[in-house]
């Protein structure tokens, strides 16, 4: 039975830029930065000789988001179907005003893949 969300993980192309965005713009707290490699992480992620850099950032309520940068396999050198697997769908935050939050993110370097549509 699910009782809560432990954490979410999203793949980013550059960990340092992602840390800046999530801590300075979204204002999450940086908890930890670490590197992982070896047989264990290779088995979990399903890639031979996997090497990743990970930063944990936390919301004010303690929800953890893992920002993951792949070192090996390199997303640029992976086959197209593998590149698609080195991503995450999305992450959703509860906010007080969605339109203001959207505009704030765009003004501070956020990218919208589609025009925003706000529902009443």
Residue ranges and their predicted role:
Residues 2, 46-49, 82-85:
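A generic structural micro-feature
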Residues 13-16, 31-32, 59-63, 69-120:
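Vicinal oxygen chelate
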Residues 1-9, 28-42, 73-81:
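Short N-terminal helix-initiation segments at or just after the protein's N-terminus
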Residues 1-15, 47, 116:
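Short secondary-structure boundary segments
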Residues 11-62, 100, 107:
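Core segments of cupin and vicinal oxygen chelate
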Residues 5-7, 52, 86-90:
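Short, solvent-exposed beta-strand edge segments and adjacent coil->beta transition regions
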């Amino acid at each position: 039975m699910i009782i809560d969300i432990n954490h979410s993980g999203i793949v980013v192309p550059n960990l340092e830029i992602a840390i800046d965005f999530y801590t300075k713009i979204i204002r999450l707290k940086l908890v930890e930065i670490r590197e992982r490699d070896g047989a264990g992480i290779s088995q979990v992620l399903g890639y031979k000789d996997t090497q990743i850099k990970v930063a944990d950032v936390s919301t004010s309520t303690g929800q953890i988001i893992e920002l993951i940068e792949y070192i090996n396999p390199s997303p640029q050198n992976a086959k197209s179907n593998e590149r698609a697997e080195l991503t995450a769908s999305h992450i959703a935050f509860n906010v007080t005003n969605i339109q203001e939050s959207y505009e704030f993110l765009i003004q501070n370097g956020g990218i919208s893949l589609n025009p925003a549509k706000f529902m009443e």
